[in-house]
């Protein structure tokens, strides 16, 4: 499965806003994992590199960050931005995450890896898991932020149109081989690869109107329906009902709940 949300400029900008909203949670996870100055870290499914830039600043000039993604436009953007930001310790490489890892990466020498919202888009997780296993040294940490229940994305009260949209997204991703509840499968898979789960927590959030997490959900509700309509799985009448429901929510006391995101920190044994 490819990244079904697209790699156009609108999605790039949305990813930037998304990273800002979830930046504190990412940095807290890196603290727990002990990512520090001088480390050599992988950013798996780095996209345009918003997390990579933060990781590069964390490891400093004595460290190294390698972003890996299968979108040529995102890799180009990341490398251009790394040069502009004067981050020579950061570079990105184009890699098919559904294929074998190159020997230059799979050398058992990396100190850690960061992976957020990637596993849910992969039809087959085995190549990624093999890449992680063959890249990290013993004792290295893998930090994952992936969804365990995407259908918790909801609006209360009067969220029928949002619920219909959420169900449409789930079916659309599953039809392309994705798994929006992938975090539930990761413990068994990573245990088989010789990893130990050392820390985990829920990052599910509930938020009122105007809260940054509510704005994040509204941002997605604004940007993604156009692609579902283009793919023929979401109608203009459904979109009109969704927009009316969001407008009503903004004019009343409403509670937004995010998809159930789970943090897992694993150590290679």
Regions found by a protein language model. Name each.
Residues 2-22:
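Class I SAM-dependent methyltransferase Rossmann-like catalytic core
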Residues 143-211:
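Conserved catalytic/acceptor-binding region of the Class I
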Residues 111-126:
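A short SAM/SAH-binding and catalytic strip from SAM-dependent methyltransferases
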Residues 126-141:
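A short glycine-rich, Lys/Arg-flanked "PGG" loop and its adjoining helix->strand segment in the class I
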Residues 102-112:
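A short acidic, Gly/Pro-enriched loop at the edge of an enzyme's catalytic core
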Residues 20-39, 54:
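Conserved alpha-helix/loop element of class I SAM-dependent methyltransferases that forms part
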Residues 42, 48-102:
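Class I SAM-dependent methyltransferase SAM/SAH-binding core
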Residues 180-181, 198-269:
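Conserved Class I S-adenosyl-L-methionine
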């Amino acid at each position: 499965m490819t990244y079904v949300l697209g790699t156009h400029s609108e999605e790039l900008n949305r990813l930037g806003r998304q990273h800002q909203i979830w930046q504190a949670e990412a940095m807290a996870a890196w603290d727990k994992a002990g990512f520090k100055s001088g480390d050599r870290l992988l950013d798996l499914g780095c996209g345009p590199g918003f997390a990579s830039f933060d990781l590069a600043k964390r490891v400093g000039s004595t460290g190294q960050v390698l972003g890996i993604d299968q979108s040529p436009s995102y890799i180009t953007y990341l490398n251009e931005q790394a040069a502009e930001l004067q981050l020579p310790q950061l570079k990105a490489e184009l890699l098919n995450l559904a294929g074998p890892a190159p020997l230059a990466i799979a050398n058992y020498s990396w100190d850690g890896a960061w992976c957020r919202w990637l596993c849910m888009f992969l039809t087959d997780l085995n190549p990624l898991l093999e890449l992680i296993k063959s890249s990290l040294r013993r004792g290295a940490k893998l930090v994952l932020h992936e969804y365990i229940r995407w259908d918790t994305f909801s609006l209360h009260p009067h969220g029928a149109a949002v619920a219909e949209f959420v169900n449409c997204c789930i079916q659309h991703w599953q039809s392309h081989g994705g798994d929006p509840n992938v975090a539930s499968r990761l413990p068994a898979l990573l245990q088989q690869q010789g990893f130990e789960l050392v820390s985990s927590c829920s990052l599910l959030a509930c938020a009122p109107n105007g809260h940054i997490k509510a704005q994040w959900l509204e941002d997605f509700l604004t940007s993604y329906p156009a692609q579902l309509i283009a793919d023929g799985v979401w109608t203009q009448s459904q979109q009109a009902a969704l927009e009316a429901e969001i407008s009503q929510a903004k004019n009343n006391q409403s509670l937004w709940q995010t998809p159930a995101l789970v943090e897992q920190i694993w150590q290679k044994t």
